[in-house]
């Protein structure tokens, strides 16, 4: 399996609504590695590694609104180098 990396910045009502935890659960279920963290501007950063199908599924999940309780106004994504991370974690 060829691994790819993507960095996604998510904007909207994405802090204080369980977004990081739900993203963590979703990523674990879909066997992605990487991390999710809150940013000081109120957005959330997701760095995810997986095959192209896994990453496309993540993007589709965000397009569909992501976790319940969140309101995604928009998000941007770009490719990134793959790091050797064995799991998906929530960074604080």
Curated annotation (Swiss-Prot):
Molecular function GO terms recorded: acylphosphatase activity
Catalytic class of the enzyme: hydrolase
Catalytic activity as recorded in UniProt: an acyl phosphate + H2O = a carboxylate + phosphate + H(+)
PROSITE patterns xref list: ACYLPHOSPHATASE_1, ACYLPHOSPHATASE_3
Enzyme Commission designation: 3.6.1.7
Family of this protein: Belongs to the acylphosphatase family.
Protein name (record): Acylphosphatase
Annotated organism of origin: Photorhabdus laumondii subsp. laumondii (strain DSM 15139 / CIP 105565 / TT01)
Gene: acyP
